């Protein structure tokens, strides 16, 4: 960065604040209601309605006094109970208590009707215990009633300026070569020191004026002692911290400033664990995150904190060489930890530990892969996970790093691959790269941000759109993919919204058109996946035109293929739009599409049965049989398949169902009821058994379910009345499925190809005497599956 005398003079003399505003990504002065100027301590008669304080501007090393006078209509006007303050400094740092705690230290003195007084003594700093805080810019305070947890009455937030306090003046930047080659956290061999390296160069070839480390190793105090050095060749800020205890976890942040952009504190984008002051406490209460582990440094900083440990305990993998069996024909179980299990009576409390206990259930079902919805650190605790902010850290909402590894290890023991849903199209404003160059006025990434677009060039983005043409983004994504494959032993990925991996502008009508640049980007990522683990799979949520999807499939990738409408229609007993033949296309390799009847994003077939179509008033028995017939014309089709969790039990809560138990008008990400009690219902258990039987047949006879074995099917709308039909034939084995989706029995003629004994799944035998058109009776809402060999169920 080119520095002139003006910049250097400013850097040496400016007084920099330390507090971060929660609504912005950059640090700034917080303002509140205007407070009257006072040159003396006011009498009760001089107090105005609202907030009053003396002195008008506090000093950190002096006493401060605050009065609140309630106006008619205020929550506390006429209130006779005790009044307490909720108080902090800067952006609610050093808040001494949780909301609603009634202790004498926070109790305001009632000095007259509707007037309360609170004193910070002996000094502002000493009252807060903030003697070492680098700078106090303001005191934030509100007054509340003593029943705030049950019947809240409170004032608005007030902010009182603090002047003449400690300041920080950065030293001139030292230019020095960085001893490490990659950005991130680099422990020494003995673990007693660690080098931090942070990339910083914007699209205008400028960088921040200075960077400092703050953390547990320096009690979060901003000082020139921990000011980072600059390597202009690597574009790194870097610093080596010594005196580290290898067995201890440390929290830290980068604190950076510039005359142009102000100040910002960020975590390390490559850290493997973070602390969140707004959300972690709930995980501790729930027992998901250990109370004995490192906790957020409340009162000492704001924003997400990165964690490092130079010599962490290593996980002892029981299975180190797992490989997916037949990835081109795998059956995947899409799973959201949050809604798969439940702790107590509360929704959204699913954990890794509880999910691990149900692996026998998944194994018995017959799937050979689990696809986890996003688990990389996301904003908040309750989410689908498509709001990522730290890609190398697994979210603590579901458990610890070790528990994630244990889950994957246990899956591998059961012969189940684990795929991870990754979200590289976008990130939230909490991501360090977003915060580093941020437009506070518009709440967007700034124009000079080298990782993000200001606005997405495509119409489907949310949050902040990554620029995948940027070498920095490509390097980051590929490094993350390699890390996930090696550190956690994931067996592959499902990439979210890959249609957005382009810089070519488009609208809803053109975004699906073939985009050669997008193909190049995805092939580049696939090369990293394939080089790291040749057996790993890469699935795309792409939904583009066939010419592009076909090219990606021929390169080795797989693509989501949505069959929800067709199977919802057949599940409801409606023939219109129920054509299954779209599952296959001569222009697409059979292993290229991962077909699904349901996904996290689509409506549940069993719910639509209850709300629309010809089965609204049908018994549960009939509805589950219809869903079993759906499964028979889904799981027998060659090529990869995916099941959404609990679809095998006929889960019939709508995607529009809301957390409060009401029905919304559009799909939402609210937690849904966890219905393990479905297993005790004979009809739902019967559907599970149908899935399990079909999958066992598929797993035991891989040659019969290969693409080469596919011979014929009649699954269009015109085949509805006389029954749908599918035929597979390998070298020695044959299979025929006939299905009736109507509410009445049908008599039909079936092509078997040869006469003789054919075997049903239930063990019964059919003697076929007419190989071209054998008469078969199919009960309503049912299917029959025949093989030319006995099936062992």
Question: How should these model regions be labeled?
Answer:
Residues 10-18:
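Bacterial N-terminal signal peptides
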Residues 229, 374-376, 384-387, 412-414, ...:
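Active-site-proximal helices and loops of the catalytic beta/alpha 8
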Residues 2-9:
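Bacterial N-terminal signal peptides that target proteins for export
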Residues 18-51, 173, 178:
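Bacterial Sec-dependent N-terminal signal peptides
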Residues 66, 167-211, 263-328:
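Basic K/R-rich, polyanion-interacting modules in nucleoproteins and related proteins
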Residues 76-133, 146-160, 193-249, 257-280:
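Aromatic-rich carbohydrate-binding modules that target alpha-glucans
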Residues 770-793:
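C-terminal beta-strand-rich structural cap/linker in extracellular carbohydrate-active enzymes
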Residues 271, 275, 281, 285, ...:
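Substrate-binding/active-site clefts of carbohydrate-active enzymes
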């Amino acid at each position: 960065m080119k520095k002139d005398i003006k910049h250097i003079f400013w850097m040496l003399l400016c007084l920099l604040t330390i507090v971060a505003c929660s609504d912005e990504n950059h640090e700034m002065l917080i303002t509140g209601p205007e407070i009257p100027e006072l040159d003396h301590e006011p009498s009760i008669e001089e107090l105005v309605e609202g907030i009053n304080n003396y002195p008008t501007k506090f000093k950190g090393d002096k006493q401060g006094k605050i009065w609140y006078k309630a106006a008619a209509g205020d929550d506390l006007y006429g209130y006779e109970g005790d009044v307490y303050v909720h108080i902090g400094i800067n952006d609610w740092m050093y808040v001494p208590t949780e909301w609603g705690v009634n202790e004498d230290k926070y109790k305001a003195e009632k000095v007259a009707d509707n007037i309360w007084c609170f004193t910070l003594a002996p000094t502002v700093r000493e009252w807060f215990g903030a003697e070492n805080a680098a700078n106090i810019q303001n005191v934030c305070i509100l007054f509340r009633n003593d029943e705030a947890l049950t019947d809240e009455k409170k004032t608005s937030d007030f902010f009182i300026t603090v002047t003449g306090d400690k300041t920080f003046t950065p030293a001139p930047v030292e230019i020095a070569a960085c001893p490490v080659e990659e950005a991130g956290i680099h422990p020494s061999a003995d673990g007693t020191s660690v080098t931090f390296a942070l990339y910083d160069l914007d699209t205008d070839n400028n960088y921040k004026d200075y960077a400092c480390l703050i953390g547990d190793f320096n009690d979060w105090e901003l000082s020139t002692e921990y000011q980072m050095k600059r390597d202009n060749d690597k574009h790194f800020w870097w610093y080596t911290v010594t005196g580290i205890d290898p067995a201890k976890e440390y929290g830290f942040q980068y604190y950076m400033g510039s005359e142009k952009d102000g100040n910002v504190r960020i975590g390390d984008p490559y850290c493997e664990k973070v602390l969140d002051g707004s959300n972690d406490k709930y995980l501790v209460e729930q027992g998901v995150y250990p109370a004995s582990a490192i906790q957020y440094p409340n009162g000492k900083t704001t924003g997400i904190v990165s964690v490092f440990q130079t010599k962490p305990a290593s996980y002892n993998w029981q299975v180190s060489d797992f490989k997916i069996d037949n990835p081109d024909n795998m059956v995947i179980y899409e799973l959201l930890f949050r809604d798969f299990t439940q702790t107590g009576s509360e929704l959204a409390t699913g954990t890794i530990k509880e999910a691990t206990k149900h692996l026998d259930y998944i194994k018995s079902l017959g799937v050979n892969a689990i696809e986890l919805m996003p688990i990389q650190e996301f904003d908040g605790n309750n989410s689908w996970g498509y709001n990522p902010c730290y890609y190398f850290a697994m979210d603590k909402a579901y458990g610890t790093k070790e528990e994630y590894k244990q889950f994957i290890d246990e899956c591998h023991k059961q012969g189940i691959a684990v795929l991870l849903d990754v979200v590289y199209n976008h990130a939230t404003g909490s991501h360090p790269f977003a915060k580093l160059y941020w437009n506070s006025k518009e709440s967007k990434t700034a124009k000079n941000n080298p990782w993000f677009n200001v606005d997405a060039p495509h119409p489907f983005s949310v949050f902040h759109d990554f620029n995948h043409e940027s070498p920095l983004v490509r390097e980051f994504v590929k490094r993350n993919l390699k890390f996930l494959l090696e550190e956690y032993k994931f067996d592959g990925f499902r990439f979210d919204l890959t249609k957005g991996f382009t810089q070519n502008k488009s609208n809803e009508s053109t975004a699906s058109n073939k985009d050669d640049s997008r193909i190049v980007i995805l092939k580049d990522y696939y090369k990293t996946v394939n080089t790291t683990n040749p057996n790993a799979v890469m699935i795309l949520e792409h939904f583009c035109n066939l010419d592009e999807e076909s090219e990606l499939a021929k390169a080795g990738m797989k693509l989501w293929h949505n069959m929800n409408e067709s199977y919802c229609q057949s599940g409801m007993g409606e023939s219109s739009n129920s054509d299954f033949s779209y599952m296959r296309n001569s222009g697409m390799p059979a292993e290229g599409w991962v077909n699904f009847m349901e996904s996290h994003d689509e409506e549940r077939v069993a719910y639509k049965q209850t709300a629309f179509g010809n089965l609204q008033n049908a018994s549960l028995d009939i509805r589950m049989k219809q869903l079993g017939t759906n499964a028979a014309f889904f799981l027998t089709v060659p090529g990869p398949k995916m099941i959404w969790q609990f679809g095998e039990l006929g889960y019939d809560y709508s995607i529009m169902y809301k957390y409060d138990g009401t029905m919304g008008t559009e799909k939402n990400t609210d937690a849904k009821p966890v219905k393990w009690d479905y297993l005790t219902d004979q009809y739902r258990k019967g559907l599970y058994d149908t899935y399990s039987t079909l999958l066992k047949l598929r797993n035991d006879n891989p040659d019969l379910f290969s693409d080469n074995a596919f011979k014929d099917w009649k699954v269009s709308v015109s085949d509805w009345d006389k029954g749908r039909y599918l035929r597979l034939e390998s070298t020695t084995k044959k299979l025929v499925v006939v299905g009736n989706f109507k509410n009445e029995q049908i008599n039909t003629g079936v092509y078997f190809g040869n006469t003789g004994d054919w075997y049903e799944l239930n063990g019964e035998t059919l003697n076929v005497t007419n190989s071209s058109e054998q008469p078969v009776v199919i009960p309503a809402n049912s299917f029959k599956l025949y093989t030319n060999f006995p099936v062992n169920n």
